[in-house]
Structure formats: structure tokens, C-alpha cells
Amino acid sequence: MNTSHQKIIALLGPTNTGKTYVAIEKMLEFDTGIFGLPLRLLAREVYDKCVQKVGVEKVALITGEEKIIPSTANYFICTVESMPKDKKVDFIAIDEIQMCADRERGHIFTERLLESRGNKLTMFLGSQIMGKIINDLVKNVVFEKKERFSKLSYTGIKKISRLDRKVAIIAFSIEAVSYTHLTLPTTLVV
């Protein structure tokens, strides 16, 4: 599948290290591109950023709930499920590639990992945990690592009402996330 003129990059690193930003900038260096994202809200955010840079007539948004497809679109920002399979483009990126391990949607991410290729560049963005799997499944992949801009550290248990600025709250279930959000002081920006 990978020919000599195609390049495949796995840009891996922790959350919030600028991987998506790098891929947006890289995509816009090419004439055409598809960007697959795991969430429709994230797809909308990337769509808005691309529209600001190149204009509304050059960017399409395709999700399960929303379709904005100008006839002159060169860049297609999509949820991974909505990525056009038959469209040939210079650049393809798939964000949060570690979703290959997801019970419900993993098969779609895995299919894109194995089959989706840009004519010139393909980028897989996500967690370093995917490094070995990508290396085993994708030929001639180049690995690039992104480091976190700032250090995260554990400061112990604190009351939610006494949180400092720039604090990350870690929760391990949707119920814990919902409860935490409901108990946050209304003065905090979430």
C-alpha cells in the first residue's frame, strides 16, 4: 500500500502537546487533505480553525450530524466514521489513533490505520502506547515524539472548592466526570 513517494508519520505523545495543531498546519501545506477526528465537536473546532486560515469555500465538515461540503472544498474535516474512503488526497491525518483499542469504535480506527493513506503524507496522532502496534502493522512509518509543554505533578487530595489555577482533575469513569463537573464551583472555567 505504501509506495516510495508516500510518507507515513506517527506523531505520538501525551494529551495536549500540540499534535493536532502540527497536523492542521501540515495538512494546509498540501493542496488537498482529509483529517479524521474522534469527536464531532473536535471536528467542528478543527473545521473552524481551517476556515479561518484558508476560507469557508475550501473546507468541508462531515460528521454524523453535520455536513457542510462546498463544491470547491480541498480539505475535509470529519469524524473518523465519516471520512470519505474513495477520495484521493495528498494528506490524511487520523487523530487519537489509540482509539483502535476502543470496544465500540476501535474497528473503524483500525480500518483507517490499515487502509487510509494520503498520496503524499499520512499522519497518525495519538498516545505513545500505539508505537509498537503501528510499527508492527504499518511499513516504513517514521516515528516523531511530542513532549508535554509543562510538567504535570500530583499535589495530593484537595477539596474541589479550593483548587488552584491550571489544575487537571483525573477521573476514571463517566460517572466520576459528571459528578466532578456538577460539584465544581461556578467560578471555575471548565
Positions of PLM-derived features:
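Conserved lysine of the Walker
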Residues: 19
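Hydrophobic anchor at the beta1->P-loop junction of P-loop NTPases
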Residues: 11
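Conserved small/polar residues in nucleotide/adenosyl-binding loops
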Residues: 180-186
